[in-house]
Curated annotation (Swiss-Prot):
It is an enzyme of class 7 (translocase). The lineage of its organism: Bacteria, Pseudomonadati, Pseudomonadota, Gammaproteobacteria, Aeromonadales. This is ATP synthase subunit beta. Belongs to the ATPase alpha/beta chains family. Its EC number is 7.1.2.2. It comes from Aeromonas hydrophila subsp. hydrophila (strain ATCC 7966 / DSM 30187 / BCRC 13018 / CCUG 14551 / JCM 1027 / KCTC 2358 / NCIMB 9240 / NCTC 8049). SMART domains: AAA. Produces ATP from ADP in the presence of a proton gradient across the membrane. The catalytic sites are hosted primarily by the beta subunits. It is a peripheral membrane protein. The gene is atpD. Pfam families: ATP-synt_ab, ATP-synt_ab_N, ATP-synt_VA_C.
Length: 462
């Protein structure tokens, strides 16, 4: 336990001088011990810059810090509570409770910096995780123990989709979940907490928040805090769900820290260590022989450009990508998932079975043909199409509408009750549309319903 003194403060980056023979190691946690504003502030060592001086990022606001304040080295990295005592609680990046419900009462604490499981410890699984959301289960099915990205620009429904997934899986799947709110709105965090409370699944979820208004150090590390809690559940032999909203803010916090530490920026101003930082996080999110982590990550797409370095780096790590499209949202079809852009490694006849595979590909073929015909329709009108193409367009429009679905978490806004659709029902419905069994029904009947039986009922009332 060595002591040092603050020598320089530049925003969230602080330089601290220690005796030459007691310089802290990189990632060691330091704490301000001098009385006054800033007391108890935790800092994490990022660089040793010679002469006994270490450069740190603050894990909280640097307001009130001044040169000469005394800092003590804890001799270890940031340690956070893990285990069942974290369930139903909201914590910050350091694992301190922020829900005013008293101490966590944990039995052990783990470091947030841990090595990824070794190659021989990892395991793969082809089991599917049913989400109850038609478009996802059909076109981009999730694997148990896999990684899923929800890609979308601003305001197309990433957080709502994520909340619906958590609700459906928590209720139907009865496992534990960890939710890491990385640099998102405090209001959303609050809504999410109350949503979990009303669904009676709060006692199965650990919540870790590092919001938009917090310093970059918090936002950069909060994903690791949540992941550490998920790893503990996995190592106890459980199947755990790990949700991150939003992985882009993790990258952005890294960009801010990188600039403050004086590193040269790379493409589009991102940090030069972008791929490495992403890899360090993503490689730990994996399934081992003892348990699995299934992760769902929301990925903000800057300016709707999927080739931006941040989303492009994330793509490489995922098993399934759910792409949310502004064009589909503009049609009023929610969830606004693009069935032609979304992919999954599980959509393979050997994994999902021939029936599911052919139905999904059939749906995509019809929608792709409709997309090609749209130009002709815009210029010449529907009358110039062949009978076969007219039928394709009619079915495509029904499929488009049938891909929409009322959500449980959006009942407050839509006024229609949420629907959970089992995979078998989803396949049966789309097969029927492709075979022409519902050609006589009006397309409005397919909008915002659950199973195909509801479509038939709705059509009778129209």
């Amino acid at each position: 336990m060595s002591n040092g003194f603050i020598v320089q403060i530049i925003g969230a980056v602080v330089d601290i001088e220690f005796p030459q023979d007691a310089v802290p190691q990189v990632y060691d946690a330091l704490k301000v011990v001098s009385e006054g504003q800033g007391q108890g502030l935790v800092l994490e060592v990022q660089q040793q810059i010679g002469g006994g001086v270490v450069r740190c990022i603050t894990m909280g606001s640097s307001d009130g810090l001044r040169r000469g304040l005394e800092v003590v080295n804890s001799g270890k990295s940031i340690q956070v509570p893990v285990g069942v005592s974290t369930l139903g609680r909201i914590m910050n990046v350091l694992g301190d409770p922020i829900d005013e419900k008293g101490p966590i009462g944990e039995e052990e604490r783990w470091s947030i910096h841990r090595a990824a499981p070794s190659y021989e410890d990892q395991s793969n699984s082809n089991d599917l995780l049913e989400t109850g959301i038609k478009v996802i289960d059909l076109v981009c099915p999730f694997a148990k123990g896999g990684k899923v990205g929800l890609f979308g620009g601003a305001g197309v429904g990433k957080t709502v989709n994520m909340m619906e997934l958590i609700r459906n899986i928590a209720i139907e799947h009865s496992g534990y979940s960890v939710f890491a709110g990385v640099g998102e709105r405090t209001r959303e965090g609050n809504d999410f907490y109350h949503e979990m409370m009303e669904s009676n699944v709060l006692d199965k979820v650990s919540l870790v928040y590092g919001q938009m208004n917090e310093p970059p150090g918090n936002r950069l590390r909060v994903a690791l805090t949540g992941l550490t809690m998920a790893e503990k559940f996995r190592d106890e032999g459980r199947d755990v769900l790990f949700f991150v909203d939003n992985i882009y803010r993790y990258t952005l916090a890294g960009t801010e820290v990188s600039a403050l530490l004086g590193r040269m920026p790379s493409a589009v101003g991102y940090q030069p260590t972008l791929a490495e930082e992403m890899g360090v996080l993503q490689e730990r999110i994996t399934s081992t022989k003892t348990g699995s982590i299934t992760s769902v990550q929301a990925v903000y797409v800057p300016a709707d450009d999927l080739t931006d370095p941040s989303p492009a780096t994330t793509f490489a790590h995922l098993d399934a990508t759910v792409v949310l499209s502004r064009q589909i949202a503009a049609l009023g079809i929610y969830p606004a998932v693009d069935p032609l852009d979304s992919t999954s490694r599980q959509l393979d006849p050997l994994v999902v079975g021939k029936e599911h595979y052919e139905t999904a590909r059939g749906v995509q073929t019809v929608l792709q043909r409709y997309k090609e015909l749209k130009d002709i329709i815009a210029i010449l009108g529907m009358d110039e199409l062949s009978e076969e193409d007219k039928l394709t367009v009619a079915r495509a429009r029904k499929i488009e509408r049938f891909l929409s679905q009322p959500f449980f978490v959006a009942e407050v806004f839509t006024g229609s009750p949420g629907k959970y659709v089992p995979l078998k029902e989803t396949i049966r419905g789309f097969q029927g549309i492709l075979k022409g069994e519902y050609d006589d029904l009006p397309e409005q009947a397919f909008y915002m319903v659950g199973s195909i039986d509801e479509v038939v009922e709705k059509a009778k009332k129209l």
